[in-house]
Amino acid sequence: MFTMKKPLLLLFFLGTINLSLCEEERNADEEEKRDGDDEMDAEVEKRFLPAVLKVAAHILPTAICAISRRC
């Protein structure tokens, strides 16, 4: 009976280690996905900001002239 317990304990121990490693890898993958979303948001902001500045550069002088009526 004792000889059966050793292999079973070994299998249980190895299975526990395997599950632990898989869980760590899964957590690392989830962190990479979250970091990737932040990078994508930053890229969208970088592309969006110059377009907004160009539009503002064209509209702002016209709006100032219309408000002050000095143009």
Swiss-Prot record:
InterPro entries to which the protein is assigned, alphabetical: Antimicrobial_frog_1, Frog_antimicrobial_propeptide
Biological process according to GO: defense response to fungus; defense response to Gram-negative bacterium; defense response to Gram-positive bacterium; hemolysis in another organism
Keyword Cell membrane set for record: no
Tissue expression: Expressed by the skin glands.
Signal peptide from the UniProt entry: 1-22
GO cellular component: extracellular region
Propiece residues: 23-45
Role of this protein: Antimicrobial peptide. Active against some Gram-negative and a variety of Gram-positive bacterial strains. Active against fungus C.glabrata 090902 but not against C.albicans ATCC 10231. Shows hemolytic activity against human erythrocytes.
Protein name: Brevinin-1SN1
